[in-house]
Amino acid sequence: MSIETNLIAGTTVGSPTIIYTSSGDSAVTSMFFCNTDSNDIDVTVFIVPSGQTLGDEHTIMKTLSISTTDTFAFGSERILLGNGDTIQAFASTTNKVSAVISYTGI
């Protein structure tokens, strides 16, 4: 099992932050999004297959509001990714949401 951590720098007016890139086939076991700010923050998350351009069809969470200093856990199902697939995210405030991805190679 491995862990990937990032701050979400991308906002809806710029490019999303790539918070995980699959190296080979992998299974994402859980994702945590922690709001470290003193205000609520909206987060949108996408899973983009290798070679594709980000689009609405890749959305897995849309404008999810995370309360001040709260954490949202996403982990009820495993997400299987192929080599080069990415998890990308936008946040309404730059560098205030910590994204932690737990995954394993398969």
Where are these regions (language model features)?
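A generic short-segment signal for beta-strand/edge and adjacent turn/coil regions
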Residues: 1-2, 11-16, 31-33, 56-58, ...
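A generic structural signal for short beta-strands and their flanking turns/coil linkers
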Residues: 27-29, 39-41, 62, 70, ...
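C-terminal interaction-tip segments
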Residues: 1-26, 30, 49-51, 84, ...
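Intrinsically disordered, low-complexity Pro/Gly/Ser/Thr-rich segments with frequent PxxP/GP/PP motifs
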Residues: 50-86
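Extended low-complexity, serine/threonine- and proline-enriched intrinsically disordered segments
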Residues: 45-47
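Short solvent-exposed strand-capping/beta-turn motif centered on an Asx-Ser/Thr pair
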Residues: 33-38, 92
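Acidic glycine-/aspartate-rich tracts in secreted/extracellular proteins
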Residues: 36-39, 50-52
